[in-house]
């Protein structure tokens, strides 16, 4: 369990527990959205290219049969509760962590409806969230997208976590203070 590892690091005194961030893309986006629906330990989260609703994802993504065959016991129309219970969207009301959602507009592996839907659900509930869409980019934006968009993506992520995790800069001191 990821929280067991985190607890071990915390117990050693290596980190400030008030400034924890979490994030991931694709499968990591699934894990991040699931994690922040289970705990409020994190001060900021990045959910990138997520799958948050496995039922809809199963019928619209490019690997549409994969999840039904390998992760679930049947198709979503035959086993809707299994899909819902394992989908991070069902935990959205519990989220207390500010969330940055990043989605590529040409992503067929985790189509836009997943990231946009998650963002919309957070906003409908009054949760702090920001959505960034990258046009003409695919699921591989972080590795092989247009260089300008890869740089922009990293700047957005850095800004998001810097604002939420780092202490504010100290006020300048003048001579005689």
Show which residues each predicted segment covers.
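Active-site-proximal cap/loop segments of hydrolase catalytic domains
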Residues: 1-177
């Amino acid at each position: 369990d990821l929280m067991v590892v985190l607890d071990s690091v915390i117990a050693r005194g290596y980190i400030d527990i008030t400034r924890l961030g979490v994030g991931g893309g694709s499968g990591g986006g699934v894990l991040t959205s699931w994690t922040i629906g289970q705990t409020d330990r994190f001060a900021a989260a990045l959910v990138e290219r997520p799958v948050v609703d496995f039922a809809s994802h199963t019928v619209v993504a490019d690997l549409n049969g994969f999840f039904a065959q390998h992760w679930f016991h049947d198709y979503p129309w035959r086993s809707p509760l299994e899909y819902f219970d394992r989908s991070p969207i069902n935990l959205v009301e519990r989220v207390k962590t500010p969330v940055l959602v990043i989605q590529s507009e040409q992503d067929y592996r985790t189509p836009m409806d997943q990231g946009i839907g998650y963002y919309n659900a957070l906003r409908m509930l009054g949760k702090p969230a920001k959505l960034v869409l990258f046009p003409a980019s695919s699921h591989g934006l972080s590795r092989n997208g247009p260089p300008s968009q890869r740089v922009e993506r990293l700047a957005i992520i850095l800004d998001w976590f810097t604002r939420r995790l780092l202490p504010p800069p100290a006020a300048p001191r003048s001579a005689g203070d």
